From Swiss-Prot:
The keyword Transcription applies. This is Probable transcriptional regulatory protein Plav_2114. The keyword Disulfide bond does not apply. Coiled coil: none annotated. Signal peptide: none annotated. GO terms for cellular component: cytosol. Keywords: Cytoplasm, DNA-binding, Transcription, Transcription regulation. InterPro entries: Integrase-like_N, TACO1_YebC-like_2nd/3rd_dom, TACO1_YebC_N, Transcrip_reg_TACO1-like, Transcrip_reg_TACO1-like_dom3, YebC-like.
């Protein structure tokens, strides 16, 4: 997924996932709670909750934490989170989409705007950059789950629109409202996916060089580090050699 995947890979290689594990768990728990509150607390009948639990398992979140997050959805008087999307431009003119879960719109808007401004970006209005992305369902499997040929054959049969395979794994795309059905079809053949969620996929990407790439990654890391931010998407790409350098 271009910028989104490259940024996550760099953070993982730098060890940021371990250093911020408690913060990561808090974000995963928040999504589980919101998903359970918006639908049934049973993942079998709640696709969003099922996806949230899958994401938590991938990060080795303890089962007790997951169960507490689900139980919290029924607590009376707890926080009421709302989903708010922010869009803007980062260094080099890249488009950035920030998805948040917040209990205070004013606080979150101020913090997100500050991060954009401090890093040479510009927060825009809703719709400012989303037209440069496609809203799609994404299902991910590790590379050893199947061969590229077997995966694409199963993807077509399950109703996916696109399948991209490489050393990092398999990425299958479908219409957002078909995500649950496609994921179930693939699960019957390859087992539970590594992830199944709705994403923003850039239609085109902007290639970044050394200095600009460093500035962009600094901004994305600051956004990702914010407690209210759940996901960050950007339409950039960088060479493998530059990615290795940024990961050091």
């Amino acid at each position: 997924m271009a910028g989104h995947s490259q940024f996550k890979n760099i953070m993982y290689r730098k060890g940021a996932q371990d250093k911020k594990r408690s913060k990561l768990f808090a974000k995963l728990a928040k999504e589980i709670t919101v998903a359970a509150k918006m639908g049934l607390p049973d993942p079998e009948y709640n696709p969003r909750l099922r996806a949230a639990i899958q994401a938590a398992r991938v990060e080795n979140m303890p089962k007790d934490n997951i169960e507490r997050a689900i139980k919290k959805s029924s607590d009376q008087g707890g926080e009421n989170y709302e989903e708010v999307r922010y869009e803007g431009f980062g260094p080099g003119g890249i488009g950035v989409i920030v998805e948040t879960l917040t209990d205070n719109r004013n606080r979150t808007a101020g913090e997100v705007r500050s991060i954009f401004t401090k890093n040479g970006g510009n927060l825009g209005e809703t719709g400012a950059v989303s037209f440069m992305f496609d809203r799609l369902g994404l299902i991910e499997y590790p590379a050893d789950a199947a061969s590229a040929d077997d995966m694409i054959e199963a993807a077509i049969e399950a109703g996916a629109d696109d399948c991209q395979s490489g050393e990092a794994g398999h990425e299958l795309y479908c219409a957002p409202d078909a995500l649950h059905e496609v994921a179930q079809g693939l699960e019957s053949k390859f087992g539970e996916a590594r992830a199944a969620r709705i994403v923003w996929k850039p239609q085109n990407t902007i290639a970044l060089e050394d200095e600009k790439a460093e500035t962009v990654l600094k901004m994305l890391e600051a956004l990702d580090d914010n407690d209210d931010v759940q996901q960050v998407y950007a339409n950039f790409e960088m060479s493998d050699s530059l990615m290795e350098k940024m990961s050091a």
